Amino acid sequence: VKSHLINRDEAEQYQVLIYNGNIKVYTLAGVEKTVVNATGATNYITNANPEKNFSCITVADYTFVINKTKVTAKDTTASASRPDEAIYYVKNGQYRTTYKIIIDGTEVANFQTLDNSNASNASSITTDNIATELTNDLNSNLSGYTIVRDGSIIYVKKDSGTFTSSVEDGLGGDGLIQLKDKIGSFSDLPYKGYTGFQIEITGDKGTEFDNYFVRWDGNAWVETVKDGLKNDFDKSTMPHLLIRTADGNFRFTPADGSSYTIGSTSYDVPNFKGRTVGDETTNPDPSFIGTTINDIFFYRNRLGICADENVIFSKAGEFFNYYFSTVTTTQDDDMVDISMSHNKVSILKFGIPFNEELLLFSDQSQFILKPEETLTAKTVSINQATEYEIDDSAKPVGLGQNIYFGFKRGTFAGVREYFISSDSEMKEATDTTINLPRYITSDIFSLKGSAAENVLFALSNADRNKLFVYKFYFDANQKALQRSWSSFIFESTDVILDLDIIQNFAYIVIKRSDGVYLEKMNLKANEVDTNLDFSVLLDRKTSVTGVYNSGTNLTTWTLPYPETATRSVVLGGNWSTNFRGRSLQVNQASNTTLTATGDYSSNPAFVGRNFNFKYEFSKFYVREAKTATSKASVNLGRLQIKKMALVFGDTGFFEIDITPLARTTGTHKFTGQILGSSGFILGVPNMESGTFKLPIQCKNTDVTIVIKSDSHLPCNFLSAEWNGIYSILSQRLT
């Protein structure tokens, strides 16, 4: 399943799920919206691996859906060819001058004007009169032709087949002008033509790249496209659209210019515009034709496409136009089609806007596209930036001033942090997983993050029930002050399909044995539940009001979902001070119900699944300064850890397991119930801050120290200190 989140505005947010040949849309409250599929539209999303082969991007009410395996093509229907035709334009009339039209080698029209010996002969030299006389001859001498005169213009069309033609006059070619097939200059065109008549303007004789076509539209000569060409896209092979329609539902359709009706109002679907001017030389097909589209993105008010070794941008402001609007001149808003120049084959997989630039990813290299103030064919260039291998299963994600992308490390995976060094202005990509190379399992298929919450999530195909979490904190100069990797591990039967982030919430799509769920996780630190001074920590947490049965003296809570794991009931913030935040002793009555003795039906309670928190300390070492900014661990000698102190804040419960090598584990528990504390009330949760001290008495490499908690109460740790005895039998000589 391919998952995509649409964040239209604060009031409208939708989760899109694309299956093999099907598409569904839900609100974040779980309400399914109606999706109307245009005829044949779902053929585009027929694929056995939607997760890998589909990609989506949303702008306003339109979500572009691309199938990375679909080869784009042109429509096989060519435009209608014009019949063989010509226009004869009587440009000048002079006394005693002969005007001739020759067709297929035979003179079919001949007229000689009178001399100027008589003033009445002036009517003989008018251009309209000459055209009339020539037309009379044409009508007398030709059959199988359509002949129309309009003033000094004569239009001739052969009803079937082709013909050759030439003209003669006594004025050196300046009296009778022929327009057939092509003409040298736009200035040679008559003041008017025949509606639909088309001709090629050849321009310079040494090149075909300045040729263009014009036709008479009934009022003026306008630029047009050569007839008989395949100018349109095969819309069934182009990116499709998921449109949020005026009634609040959705329509999935190719961008084919079709129309649909809602109520009594008709709406038009956008259309990938075909070639409207020029020919295959002056206005060639975009380079994505005949290949697959790997990525689609927005940059500088253009819709960009990565295909093969090219990046193609639409006409500025026209996301469905990939042809020139005129071939007579170059315009700043023209489409742009540019290819790589590299000594390796560089198939472009992704385009990511980055610090006003565009970062382009191939399998082994990264390229920077940085135009001037405007993106035009004249100003654009692509330069190689770095060479890092990437895993193209997951699209890189930009967070703040960094871009994160995955790479393979044998049967494991890593994530690089791409940035511009503030010291050297060089582009670098540090390995965030260098100190734990075997932590993330292979094949990262999704990377999502939040710059506001300084967090990145990585999803792996090898561990579908895990969320790998990278947390980071940078100073004002983009220096990393803190970094960490951790993971959220769900039930072994859970399959995480994807996640997306809106503001401070991560929305997770999870497939379970009983269906697909959309669940959300609050990423904001120090959040508390209503009327509580902490957030109740339960998985799949929901607020439920219990039902009390006086006959059995039991309160029953019914979950909105089935659950077989151990669940808890915690009284919410609407309860009195002595009750709120308390966890009840409950009976797991069924997979959807919990019961507790007593009446707890007056206010809602939080119901959810218990989960385990675990943090294992790395080994403690003595460290010595190597440079002004770095330290190194000292492995020589013996370090005997005597004790440690854990500094915590706003914490209600945790346990610490200390396991010396070859000895049993000792557990030390903190419950928040501290005698003499002003917040201590028996049976009521209490959040405390302070230092928790515990003995170690073990060699640093022979002990494992783990913090854990399965409570609904929070635990927050600020730092840890240890002290011990370090002895060394050798001495370093310098």
Locations of the language-model features?
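Beta-sheet repeat architectures centered on beta-propellers
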Residues: 1-9, 413-734
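N-terminal beta-propeller domains
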Residues: 1-32, 188-347, 410-426, 657-662, ...
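Short linear interaction motifs
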Residues: 37-54, 270-294, 340-349, 589-594, ...
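Elongated alpha-helical scaffolds
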Residues: 51-72, 358-361, 367-368
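A short, polar beta-strand/turn micro-motif
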Residues: 71-86, 373-380, 385-390, 611-630
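Beta-propeller and closely related beta-pinwheel folds
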Residues: 269-301, 307-454, 462-466, 470-498, ...
